[in-house]
Design a protein with these regions (language model features):
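Activation segment signature within eukaryotic-like protein kinase domains
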Residues: 120-121
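Conserved small/polar residues in nucleotide/adenosyl-binding loops
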Residues: 137-141
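Activation-segment/catalytic-loop signature of the eukaryotic protein kinase fold
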Residues: 77
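Conserved short submotifs of the Hanks-type protein kinase catalytic core
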Residues: 85-101, 105
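Conserved N-lobe loop of protein kinases adjacent to the ATP-binding glycine-rich P-loop
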Residues: 29-36
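AlphaC helix of the eukaryotic protein kinase fold
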Residues: 43-65
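Protein kinase catalytic-loop region centered on the HRD/HxD motif
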Residues: 124-136
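Protein kinase glycine-rich loop
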Residues: 13-20, 25
Length: 141
């Protein structure tokens, strides 16, 4: 494995599992604890922008305060150097949730029964309500 596929000498990036406007998400192996994790890494083209660096850091801190069964847990954060530019690139290590997204299910044309749709919706609403209450509480403290 190349040095670029390792973060902090601990996390081995395996495959890209998602892309967003600000970051890429990788399936990785935590060799210290012997478990698979998700690593969200700020896109290298945004790493030189202090605003994006700060936003990414705030996201990590906010997410780390949350402890809910419907929200991926944050395990660690860190920084790696972009080999091309030498710039620091932050990353967040999170719980890996295996499975399919709702988008995948719908794209495959599978039907979701109303009861199952209600379960999905209730899970999302529970997580949103919890995170909203936690973030309001911590910003008032």
């Amino acid at each position: 494995m190349s040095a670029e596929s390792w973060l902090s000498g601990r996390y081995e990036l395996q495959n890209l599992i998602g892309r967003g406007g600000m970051a890429d998400v990788w399936k990785a192996r935590d060799h210290r604890l012997g478990r698979d994790v998700a690593v969200k890494k700020l896109r290298t083209d945004l790493a030189s922008d202090d605003t994006f660096q700060a936003r990414f850091q705030r996201e990590a801190q906010s997410a780390a305060r949350l402890n809910h069964p419907n929200i991926a847990a944050v395990y660690d954060t860190g920084e790696t150097k972009d080999p091309a530019t030498g710039l620091p690139v932050p990353f967040i290590v999170m719980e890996l949730i295996d499975g399919h997204t709702l988008r995948d299910v719908l794209r495959d044309g599978r039907k979701i029964l109303p009861r199952r749709a209600l379960e999905f919706t209730q899970g999302v609403l529970d997580a949103l309500s919890y995170s909203h209450a936690c973030l309001l509480y911590t910003s008032d403290a």
